Amino acid sequence: ALAGPAKVLAAEADRAAHLACQAAARGAGKPVHSLHRDLFRDPLTADEISRFDCVLLDPPRAGARNQANMIAQSSVARVVYISCNPQSWARDARRLADGGFRLAELRPVGQFRWSTHVELASLFVRD
């Protein structure tokens, strides 16, 4: 759904999720390149990221410290960051802000009715 007419790179460390992404993209006829890569251990470089207009990331609870550093060093203009851990999100958000991004939107999402768990959906932009 996100691809539209644009080219999309989907990087995923979990092999089953990676293969499911490939199959879904093929089935939908979308131009999605699925990359089996653990961005926690091997983040995309600033040069790799700079080829894109926008980055969407949804890291594990530990956050995306190394990837946030590379994003901050890139020339990408927008970052959509989904997080299940406000503490790691805050750390990574600080790195993005130090790299010239401004937090444009932040929305807490309480998607689990009988839980105190909150997901954060945020948009960072460079002006």
Q: What is the predicted function of each stretch?
A:
Residues 1-127:
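Rossmann-like S-adenosyl-L-methionine
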